[in-house]
Amino acid sequence: MNVTTFQFVTWDGGGNLPPALGIAKELHQRGHAVRVIGEESQHAAVSSAGLSFTAWSHPLASGQAERSADERLTYLIKDVWLNTDLADEVCAVLAWQPADAVVVDCMLEGVLARSAEIPASTVVLVHGLFRSVLAMRDSLIAFGNQLRAAVGLPVLETNQLAWEAKDLVVVTTMREFDGVDDEPASNIRYVGPVLPDLDSTAGWPSPWEATDPRPLVLVSLSTMIGQGSSTLAQRVLDVLADNAIRVVMTTGSLSPETLNAPGNAVVFGVIPHEAILPEVAVMVTHGGHGSVMGALAHGVPLVCIPGVAADQPIVGERIEAVGVGRMVAPDAVGELGDTVAQVLSDTSYRTAARHMEALIRRLDGITGGASAVESALDQR
């Protein structure tokens, strides 16, 4: 029996890996061979999913902690997202181990620009809002052209990085949340968010009695280095200390020991949100798509303090547009306590969040995403 092979191509962007792995694992469970090209920092997660892994010849986004935020962004744009040389590595892997379809992270524009050279069907995996990816592509092309012009390279026309020739674009969100007005092209499939551990039965070490009547607020400002700064995290804890609530903060890459938790709060480094969300009344988020979808999948309304990534302010705007929460500017965190209190008291936010919960659970992005990727084989 012939086995169909899918090659995933990714980079270490934090929240971009779980959707790719969720779909890849489902394809593997359906009997397909699945391989992943990624960064060494992703090796353990990919291998633990039972998938074959090949590392890029050098680190891409990982190992950039010593750079300033501006330096990191410039590096990502030039050496990761717009790096057409990465396509050579993809083609080399495929020459050694052919695949029937290649699933490429939407941010790897340099690889997608040369997809005509890839001897397989090409699937673009959008791990967030399609509208934010389109906005970022325009910015990337403009910024990349500035970099190219500065070193005497010819600029790229927009259509050189277009997706028109791609076989399939899989978007792991809901069209209702994305808010794209135009009817999507026939090769664009909204499959819903990919949430592998949606109904986790894992517990978490709550310091409070089960009978404590105060609402529980989950705060997560990003697992990515350079976003969830200790200054912002401490400011959030201090502001929420005056509210009659219980606060659970997860800090990701920040050490909890760097923060002073007030009496109504507890701080963890990493703890699965799925274990806490069934008890949560409101989530305070940086606007990462995965975190937001995880909360909405449990019917939890949100307060968004947008992070530095380009899509996060757009996610915050969509949170307000669909009525599932409010947005607070990073320089107006002093308003956070009042905003959280408003979202807690106004039941319309919870009602809207529960509507989104029903949509997410009906779509099931894991099975829908895997089926969409399989359909790319029919277009060869």
Regions found by a protein language model. Give the residues of each.
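Glycosyltransferase specificity loop/lid
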Residues: 1-134, 138, 142-146, 248-303, ...
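A broadly tuned preference for mixed-charge, low-complexity surface segments
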Residues: 90, 153-164, 218-233, 272-274, ...
